[in-house]
């Protein structure tokens, strides 16, 4: 029962995180760029990240903790290689998330508060690059999950 609960929490966290990044990158970003100028668009992103990132911080902790527990519950030597790939790549994704949440997002928020639109735009561009990286890494994690079955 514990394994199923951990697996459920892991999958909910992963699907929320990847789905949120996918929506932001492929849907919200182009729509906001099409209809909003930087003085409206950049505060929208700042407010969106202020809601999304704390939720994803919880998801990242749940994903890593549940994944690590499941990995150790079968033993590192007995775990399929896909599990090791998932945890390793997921750990890299967590570091990338940490850079966004703890370093780049505060710059975006501060630049928006100061109405420094070029600098806020540069911070948003960096976040976009890091989200793109995490989307690619997330696809690798999903492929590893499929191969581990």
Regions found by a protein language model. Give the residues of each.
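Polytopic transmembrane helical bundles with strong interfacial aromatic enrichment
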Residues: 1-149
